[in-house]
Regions:
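Active-site and NAD+-binding cores of ADP-ribose-processing enzymes
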Residues: 21-142
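Extended catalytic/binding region for NAD+/ADP-ribose chemistry, centered on the ART fold
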Residues: 1-23
Length: 142
């Protein structure tokens, strides 16, 4: 699974800062989480088929955004089961897309790596360590 976002802020919020509490006020962050991880900026070179997890399509599946997207860490096993079920039931789907929980101004994606053909994602520059980018972002408000 490849996680991403339409913006760097969205990508950070959906990965490195995913488990930061969804509440106002002071927040803590495990500085060890991004160590050893990297991020890349890519261009989508060919159309990808993603399952839209916006509110209207979720209603058709009988689940709400609050039950699937706007969840805390303890619900991750359930969200993983939904992703696995959508993977099985939608053999042409190459991933999932939704409005980010912590940055709802941008779309987040989870791409099924085995369904993304070579050349579909073109790197724009070298990959960088998440640690550097995450530390720059913590100097701003999250």
């Amino acid at each position: 699974m490849l996680y991403g976002g339409a913006t760097m802020d969205c990508a950070l919020m959906e990965t490195v800062f995913h488990d930061v509490p969804y509440t106002a006020g002071f927040k803590t962050f495990d500085k060890g989480k991004p160590v050893g991880q990297a991020h890349s900026t890519v261009e989508v070179a060919q159309p990808l088929r993603v399952v839209d997890l916006a509110s209207a399509p979720l209603r058709k599946l009988g689940i709400t955004r609050k039950q699937l997207i706007d969840t805390e860490k303890d619900r991750r096993p359930v969200t993983r089961q939904w992703a696995e079920a959508l993977y099985r039931q939608c053999p042409d789907a190459q991933g999932l897309s939704w409005a980010s929980r912590q940055d709802d101004s941008a779309r987040a994606v989870a791409l099924f790596g085995d369904r993304i053909p070579n050349g579909a994602l073109k790197p724009l520059g070298a990959s960088r360590a998440w640690w550097t980018t995450a530390m720059l972002m913590t100097r701003r408000s999250i």
